[in-house]
Curated annotation (Swiss-Prot):
Residues 1-33, 90-119 are extracellular. One of its GO terms (cellular component) is membrane. Keywords: Membrane, Transmembrane, Transmembrane helix. It is a multi-pass membrane protein. This is Putative uncharacterized membrane protein YBR113W. Partially overlaps CYC8. It is found in: Membrane. It comes from Saccharomyces cerevisiae (strain ATCC 204508 / S288c).
Length: 160
């Protein structure tokens, strides 16, 4: 019996089927990037925002205790990431359904207002996320320098 692709040799599906869908999703995102500029820019913006968040926020998790400001920022960034993922998935679904309509000869209506609104909301959410990351890093730097100056004053007072 010949082996079938994406199946175990005993005929069972793999335990994690989502891994088998990654290449299809990557190909679809490549097609979107080649033919449609708006979803490609949204995907690129999501990737940039995630990289910036990981680069700036993860070291702060290990250095500082989470306070109320950090928790507000954390929940805000989670909301922003959910908005971005929803808008990207909706735009990818709209793109794939439009391609299916063109394939079967039906008339497609292009980007719906819902998709355009979601992409615009994702751009605004990404802007808020980047600004809040910058605000958080500025706040932590100011707190560090303030603590350092206070410790220096205490040392000078003890020496005198």
């Amino acid at each position: 019996m010949p082996l079938r692709p994406c199946r175990h040799h005993q005929g069972f599906l793999p335990k994690k089927q989502w891994r088998a869908k990654f290449p299809q999703l990557i190909v679809l995102m490549g097609r979107v990037a080649a033919e449609e500029l708006l979803p490609a820019v949204a995907v690129a913006a999501v990737v940039v925002a995630v990289v910036v968040a990981v680069e700036r926020v993860v070291p702060l998790l290990f250095v500082h205790r989470p306070d109320s400001f950090f928790l507000i920022f954390f929940f805000q960034s989670c909301f922003v990431c959910c908005c971005c993922c929803c808008s990207c998935s909706t735009s990818l679904k709209a793109y794939s359904s439009e391609k299916e309509k063109q394939k079967y000869g039906k008339r497609g209506n292009g980007n719906t207002p819902l998709v355009q609104r979601l992409v615009t909301l994702s751009y605004l959410a990404l802007l808020i996320l980047v600004l809040s990351i910058e605000l958080l890093t500025w706040f932590v730097k100011k707190q560090r320098t303030g603590n350092k100056k206070q410790k220096d004053k205490e040392k000078n007072a003890l020496l005198l």
